[in-house]
Structures are given as structure tokens and as C-alpha cells.
């Protein structure tokens, strides 16, 4: 059956729509993405060790602590004494302990693992955007061009250079949208793929992209349902959300318990309206770049506003946007996120939507609105690709040989501009090799009076052993918190019997009898057991659904086969 509307991201009719993207397209684009990612990030990959900015302060050590826990203790760390924001490492929004490839840390060094993730996620972003556009019906040349601009724009480069590995999750947005779109158009298995992609994002500690992509999906489902006058997009979105929550419950439940009242005070300003073109076009951008009109607060820098795409790419995208048709749902989403991301001058203060939202649940987790320009850029790229395809069919198709060569030349030129602009960022990330830290709680010996002391005897990621000495009964206070709402530690005394932990000033404290003995402390985050049970049950349900659907399709095909 021919496509009803070959260039519709959200077709008004949900039945009989052809989906031209093939497995060959996906495999070929991912292989190409791997090659281009290695070439593009060659300086970062082979020029030295990750060192600068947040790599050196904490993010490198998050990955390294996982490696140490796996290789030396053969477990995943639920507790990290020197983690930022919270020592509950399972609930830590930036913790990478449940990433889908974390087992590779058994055999790879920390730096090699992070760089491998960079290449794999970048290739996923390239392939996801390419495949999404091919599914819509966009020509190969245009899909390749737009995928290059998306996967290698300055947003990813800048955040990676300053030690924000969570940004890699943003590369999964095109694949997530593509899978959801396929599910709405009748590919049932695509819904579970979308749920898996969504869950992988949060399980790997990529918390900000997880929020952005779910906002994009929610708005897309709503607007698509309005356009199609059909509730199916919303029903499948709700099922996708439920499956995501179930698969990711092992992390999401502890996170919700930890950050239910999270409201960051370190807010940074949006992108000033006067600097929008600067962010997309200006050369010489690097971490310490400070153009007039922007002020850096709370440790922020230009990476909060770096969205370089270059003049060639921006010009082509603008032409595509001008010619696009039948893409208003995604265009509305892109415009809406753009309005959120910009800091509007006093004359346009009525457009300052962010001031209405920054105190609401979900929205208040965002440190600053400028990062919303990323989902806006994604939306504009998709809409522009449709417009460029229209231009091709209307005008460029007259030159069947010259047009593909011109498109390839523009793609290479745009990639060259992006690469040249990325080099200062890549170099800023490098430095001396970082070494593993001693993650033991400090001080190693507790107690000052000599009446009661506790000395750390054994240390593992989720288990501590203290040797206690008490001249008379008393209380010892340990250098970590009691817990949020309930005790996070199971404490056993010298005989193995459980001891009652109490809170003293928010710290964990234990009442000791006179004498000497060992106290064993086992870390148990709130809702950990409920989380992994929920995730396991959801996974079984998803697998069972896929198996049953496969059998039903097989029976249906057998009935249709000629005798």
C-alpha cells in the first residue's frame, strides 16, 4: 500500500500508513555513525585523559567507583560516601550504576568505558534521527545531513567537555520518538522498544534527557491525538509511561523517595534573546567564553548556552522550516521549548513562561531554562527535514545527478564546521590521568573522649564493619545520615543480632553496651526491594507480551498462506 501522507510525522489517519524505514537503513546508519563519531571526537578520544571541570570533581569518579565495586567487590554500589548531592548512589540522579553496558567495566578502564559510551551514544543519535526521517519518507541525503547536525551540534560537545556524561542520553530522543511513532501506526513491538529506550536513559543516570524526552512525548501524543481526532496516541503514550515506570522502578522509586521535595536553588539564567544567533553561529566558543549579556552564577559557564550548528547548517535548516508543511504538532513543540529557553527582555516579559513553571513538580528540577533549547532544536530539525524534502521534490529533482552531489557537499561542509567549532571544547576536557579515590568514610576512627570509639575495620560498597570499644554504655554517631523518613542502614551487633539505629541530628547513631566488638552496617536504600521486584515483574510482562504477540502473528500468517 502506498503511503497516505508520505511526509507526515503525525499523520491524521492512523491506519494504512506505510513505514519505509528498513533494518538495513538502521544498521547502515549506525555503522556510519560509529565511524563519523570516532573521526569527529578523535581529539577527545585519543588526545589524552578526561580531566577538566566536572570530570575531575566527581563524574569520572562515579564511573570509577562502579568499576572498583564490580572488579574488586563483585557488586553494584548502592552507597558512595563522597558522591555529590546524595550518598544514596542508587537514588543519585547522575549515578551510572544501572546503565545497560555497565558490565563492560569488568574489562575496560574507567576512561575507556566513558569514551566508548560517547561513541556508541553519538552513533545512536545519528542513526536514530536518520531512521526517524527515513520512516517519514525523507530522502537519504537529507536524512544524513539533518542527522549529522543533530548528533554533532554544540550542545553535546560542550556538555561532554565539561564532564556532563548525562547529556549522552539526549542522543536517544530520535530513536524514542521513532519507536513511539511506529507503535501508534500499528507496530506493536515498537512500543516496548520505546519503553526500553526510555528506561535505559534514567537507569544510566541521564536524568535531564529523561525529563526532556518525556515532555516531548507527552506533548506529541496530545497534539497528535488532537490532529487525528483519535485517542490512540494518548493511550499508547500512557502505556509507554507505565512500562517505563515499571522497568525503571529499581531506580525511580528510590529517586522519588530521595528527591520528592527537590527544589534546586542554584538557578541560572535563560539564553538572552540577543545571544540566540550567537549561540548557533559564533566561532571561538569554549567553556570560559563570556559574551556581553550573560552572567555566570553557581558555577555555570557558556556550556549552558552552546548550541553551535554553523552557518551552513543553520541556513539549510531555515530554508527547510520555511517550506515545511503538515508538521504543526512538532513545530508547536519546538516553538514552545524555544520560548521556555530564552530570557526575554522587559518589553517582552509576557513571554517569560518559565517564571510560571519553575516552581511546579518536574519543571522545578531544571537548573535553568536554556537547556530546553535542545528539544527545541530536535523539533526544528525534524520539521526542517520535511521542508527540505519538499524543496527536493519541487525543484532539486530536476538535477538527478547534481542534486545528490550538492547535498553530500553541504553535509561534509556542515560536518567540517561543527568539527572545527568542537576542537576548543574537546581540548578543554583533557589533562592528566585521574586516579582512583579512597571512598572510605572519614574519619576512620570515631570518638574523641576515649570512652567510646569506633574504628573502620572493613569497607565494601554496601557494607561497613566498625570495631567498637566502650568503657561504659553510650552512643556513637557515624559520619553519614540516618535516612530520609526511615533508616537506610541495617545494623548488627557483635553477636549478629540486629541493633536499633537512631537519628541524632540527622546522623546515624547506635547505642552501645560496655565492652568491645564489631558492628556490621549494611546499606539498604528505601524502596530498593520494591523497585527491583517491580522492574523484574514488568520485564517478565513485557517479554510475555512480545512472545504472545509473535505467536499470534505466526498463526495469522499461517492462516493467510495459500493452501
Predicted segments with their positions:
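Start-transfer (signal-anchor) and selected internal transmembrane alpha helices
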Residues: 1-44, 236, 405-409, 540-563
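Periplasmic/ER-lumenal interhelical loops and adjacent helix-loop junctions
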Residues: 3, 60-80, 243-320, 369, ...
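Hydrophobic alpha-helical membrane-interfacial segments at the cytosolic entry of transmembrane helices
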Residues: 29-34, 230-256, 268-270, 331-338, ...
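Membrane-embedded helix bundles of polyisoprenyl
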Residues: 33-37, 123-136, 141-225, 236-255, ...
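Membrane-interface coil-to-helix junctions
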Residues: 36-126, 148-170, 272-298, 344-350, ...
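Signature aromatic-anchored transmembrane alpha helix within multi-pass, membrane-resident enzymes
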Residues: 241-245, 382, 389-419, 562-563
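Hydrophobic, aromatic-rich transmembrane alpha-helices
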Residues: 309-339, 543-549
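Active-site-proximal, structured, solvent-exposed surfaces of multi-pass membrane proteins
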Residues: 441-559
Amino acid at each position: 500500500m502506498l503511503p497516505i501522507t508520505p511526509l507526515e510525522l503525525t499523520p491524521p489517519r492512523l491506519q494504512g500508513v506505510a513505514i519505509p524505514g528498513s533494518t538495513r537503513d538502521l544498521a547502515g546508519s549506525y555503522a556510519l555513525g560509529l565511524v563519523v563519531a570516532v573521526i569527529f571526537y578523535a581529539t577527545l578520544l585519543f588526545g589524552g585523559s578526561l580531566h577538566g571541570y566536572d570530570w575531575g570533581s566527581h563524574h569520572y569518579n562515579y564511573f570509577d567507583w562502579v568499576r572498583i565495586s564490580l572488579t574488586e567487590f563483585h557488586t553494584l554500589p548502592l552507597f558512595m560516601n563522597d558522591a555529590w548531592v546524595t550518598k544514596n548512589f542508587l537514588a543519585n540522579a547522575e549515578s551510572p550504576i544501572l546503565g545497560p553496558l555497565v558490565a563492560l567495566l569488568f574489562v575496560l578502564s574507567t576512561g575507556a568505558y566513558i569514551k566508548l559510551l560517547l561513541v556508541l551514544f553519538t552513533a545512536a543519535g545519528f542513526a536514530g534521527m536518520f531512521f526517524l526521517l527515513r520512516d517519514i519518507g525523507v530522502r537519504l541525503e537529507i536524512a544524513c545531513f539533518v542527522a549529522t547536525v543533530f548528533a554533532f551540534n554544540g550542545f553535546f560537545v560542550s556538555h561532554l567537555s565539561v564532564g556532563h556524561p548525562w547529556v549522552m542520553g539526549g542522543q536517544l530522543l530520535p530513536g524514542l520518538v521513532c519507536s513511539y511513532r511506529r507503535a501508534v501506526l500499528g507496530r506493536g513491538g515498537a512500543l516496548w522498544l520505546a519503553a526500553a529506550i526510555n528506561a535505559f536513559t534514567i537507569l544510566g543516570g541521564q536524568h535531564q534527557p529523561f525529563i526532556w524526552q518525556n515532555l516531548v512525548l507527552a506533548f506529541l501524543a496530545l497534539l497528535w491525538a488532537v490532529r487525528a481526532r483519535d485517542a490512540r496516541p494518548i493511550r499508547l503514550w500512557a502505556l509507554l509511561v507505565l512500562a517505563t515506570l515499571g522497568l525503571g522502578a529499581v531506580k525511580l522509586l528510590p529517586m522519588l523517595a530521595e528527591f520528592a521535595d527537590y527544589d534546586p536553588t542554584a538557578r541560572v539564567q535563560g539564553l538572552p534573546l540577543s545571544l540566540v544567533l550567537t549561540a548557533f553561529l559564533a566561532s571561538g566558543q569554549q567553556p570560559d567564553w563570556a559574551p556581553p549579556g550573560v552572567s555566570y552564577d553557581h558555577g555555570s559557564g557558556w556550556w549552558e548556552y552552546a548550541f553551535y550548528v554553523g552557518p551552513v547548517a543553520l541556513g539549510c535548516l531555515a530554508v527547510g522550516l520555511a517550506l515545511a508543511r503538515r508538521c504543526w504538532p512538532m513545530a508547536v513543540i519546538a516553538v514552545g521549548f524555544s520560548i521556555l529557553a530564552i530570557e526575554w527582555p522587559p518589553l517582552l516579559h509576557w513571554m517569560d513562561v518559565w517564571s510560571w513553571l519553575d516552581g511546579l513538580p518536574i519543571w522545578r528540577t531544571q537548573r535553568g531554562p536554556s537547556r530546553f533549547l535542545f528539544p527545541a532544536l530536535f523539533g526544528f530539525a525534524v520539521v526542517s527535514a520535511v521542508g527540505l524534502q519538499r524543496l527536493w521534490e519541487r525543484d532539486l529533482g530536476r538535477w538527478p545527478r547534481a542534486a545528490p552531489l550538492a547535498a553530500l557537499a553541504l553535509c561534509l561542509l556542515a560536518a567540517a564546521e561543527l568539527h572545527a567549532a568542537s576542537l576548543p571544547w574537546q581540548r578543554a576536557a583533557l589533562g592528566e590521568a585521574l586516579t582512583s579515590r579512597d571512598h572510605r568514610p572519614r574519619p576512620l576512627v570515631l570518638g574523641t573522649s576515649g570512652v567510646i570509639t569506633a574504628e573502620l575495620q572493613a569497607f565494601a560498597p554496601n557494607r561497613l564493619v566498625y570495631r567498637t570499644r566502650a568503657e561504659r554504655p553510650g552512643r556513637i554517631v557515624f559520619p553519614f545520615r540516618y535516612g530520609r523518613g526511615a533508616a537506610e542502614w541495617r545494623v548488627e551487633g557483635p553477636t549478629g543480632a540486629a541493633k536499633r539505629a537512631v537519628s541524632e541530628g540527622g546522623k546515624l547513631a547506635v547505642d552501645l553496651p560496655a565492652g568491645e566488638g564489631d558492628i556490621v552496617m549494611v546499606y539498604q536504600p528505601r524502596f530498593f526491594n520494591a523497585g527491583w521486584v517491580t522492574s523484574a515483574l514488568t520485564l517478565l510482562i513485557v517479554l510475555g507480551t512480545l512472545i504472545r504477540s509473535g505467536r499470534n502473528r505466526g498463526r495469522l500468517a499461517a492462516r493467510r498462506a495459500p493452501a
